[in-house]
Amino acid sequence: MTGAASALRYWELRQEVTANNLANASTDGFKAERVFARLLNGAPVIGTHTDRREGAVHQTGQPLDIALGGDGFLVVNTPAGERYTRGGALQIDTEGFLADRDGNRVLGAKGAIQVGAGTLVVDRTGNAAVDGKTVDRLRIESTAGGATLDHAGATAFVPGATRTLVADDKRDVQQGHLEDSNADSLGGLVDMISIQRAYAAVEKTISVLDHVREVATSQLGKGAS
C-alpha cells in the first residue's frame, strides 16, 4: 500500500499545483510550479520547485508598469518582512509611495520610494526619477548566486534555505511593460485531464488492494477458527 499511497499523494499534489498554475495563467510576473518525485535513501520524496523561466514581455504604455529582464526580482516590504516579486503592475499608495498591486511598498537603495503626484521615469538600470530629478534606484536582486525561492503568494517569493539573493548586476528594466505569466494554460488543461485519469486509476488500485486485504484477513480468521 505504501507505493499506491505515495502515488495518490503525488497525483493530488499535481492536481493542486496545476490548478494553481491555471488560475494564475494571466497573472503578470507569475512563475509556475512543477511537481517532482524521486527516491531518497530508498524512500519516495515528493515536492515542488519553481519554474523561473521568463514569461513573454508586452508593452502597456503605463508608466507604473515595470518588467524585468533576466532573473532579477523587485524587493517589496510587507508586514511579514521583505519579499521578492516580478509582478510589475505597480501603483502609488495613499501616502505617495511606490507600491505593488497588494499595497506593499517597493524598495530602492534608500528605502521606500516616494513619488507623490509627480511623474515617474525609470531607466533601464532601475534609476527612478520624479519630475526629472533622480530620487532613488530600484533594489533588484537576483538568484544568479544559486539562491532558491519559495512561493509566498501569487507573485511573491521568500529565499529558500540555501542562500540569500544578491544584487542584480545585469539589471534590465523596461518601464511601460509587463512580464506575462510563464504558466501554459493549454498545456495545463491537457495535464489536468491526464492527472484526473491517473488519480482515478490509483484510487481504484487502492480500493482493489483494500478488498484483497479484507478477503485475506477474513480467510485467515476462518482458518484460525
Regions found by a protein language model. Give the residues of each.
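Amphipathic alpha-helical polymerization modules
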Residues: 1-225
